[in-house]
């Protein structure tokens, strides 16, 4: 009882709470010093300047509980930041993280939530008791002494001056230092503003893009029946495809298919679905991503050229460009939305049924876009249980101790994709027409691959495993006969350095014989004039940055070199 009274007395002391609240406010900044690859001067600034501002604000009122509650938005940011650091290991809350709150469907969020329980427990223990203590201080009108408040205000002024000097030093000694990117929580506030701006631009997309036209036309004879299928995979990384040298047989069917070219050195320019897929479906790249608000997608190009178009997706609406571009098609079906059941989780097989029905229409010119669910976590749900080849594939909780199970389940999902694509190719081949298929994945995935123990994707700083993706071109017998140079050029280019984000759209236009001012054959992997470009990545602020300027670690560059991928 004596100890309890001492503890109670300590927490009732408002001066103790004042310092406790200050420490809690600055915890995320201290943690970021250990996770972010910043020079020492930047780390000092990242703690000293925010601490001085918190100190100044806390000294405004004699009731520290009231001030602590006024700072609640920053406590929320801190909690969010700690959870993200637990999940990704580094970086501040990105613009994409805020946008994901809108674009990620509840099913995906629930799949992940169970695996964040340790981080959530940490956040609850750190913030909830402090907020309760602050609420008690407010309700009981407990106040700091005037002497204490005056003293702390003087100290706060001194720390603010020191903080400003540390900011000046950061700019002087670190050429890459940016307040909007490197100073927490200023960077988070900037990112929130950007998220609101992008949300507003997205909401006005119909108006800003209404006059856009590709001025597209076909260069192919009208009498020839043609079918082109563009397949956008999900979370499939090239490192686990045996067609690229993986030591497990994850591609037993594709390796036997005639007319298939697999491109080895392909990187995506984004590790997020809501950015990567729109780049695959349009002419925008990391260099001009913000022009997307004024453009339309590849489906419109094929429609303008006289094609019957279809878009079939095994994902839910994301209320953004994937939806906009998909709905350009004559036939559009997001199959997860068909039942009204939020738990409906069909396999990608359902997409093949829709393809079969579309082919049965026997239109002269057909263009079909498929957006699969591929290898998205939870991996074990991406393939039928009786198709499990690598075992055990359960349990697959997001914990390091289950790494082998996770890899087994993930590899099973790759084998399922292999079977899916092989069946699609056979369907097209059986049509005995000019047909071609183009496949890539939006991004890859981390599965506790190295000492960093990273998991999933969409981290503000990507890893090698998140950006190296498969890229396939298949051409039917008839197509290869009529356009032999395309296969020859594909074989010549298959070991070259390629950006899926820049080349997918352009390659599809050339495969389909679509002529438009938006076409750039130097980016088409089936063109003799294909030209390798410097690698770039679309950062959180929609800027094209080189891979050595986005925070990637030595482990990532080592893997890129091991795979023979030029990253500059």
Model segments located where?
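Metal-dependent active-site segment of extracytoplasmic phospho-/sulfohydrolases and closely related
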Residues: 229-230, 413-456, 505-509
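Active-site rim elements
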Residues: 41, 179, 286-289, 341-342, ...
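Short beta-strand segments
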Residues: 311-313, 367-374, 411-414, 436-441, ...
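Histidine-centered active-site microenvironments of extracellular/periplasmic hydrolases
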Residues: 248-249, 433-434, 440-485, 521
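Transmembrane and membrane-interface helices of multi-pass
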Residues: 1-186
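Active-site-proximal alpha/beta segments of enzymes that process anionic O-linked groups
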Residues: 161-230, 235-397, 500-501, 506-531
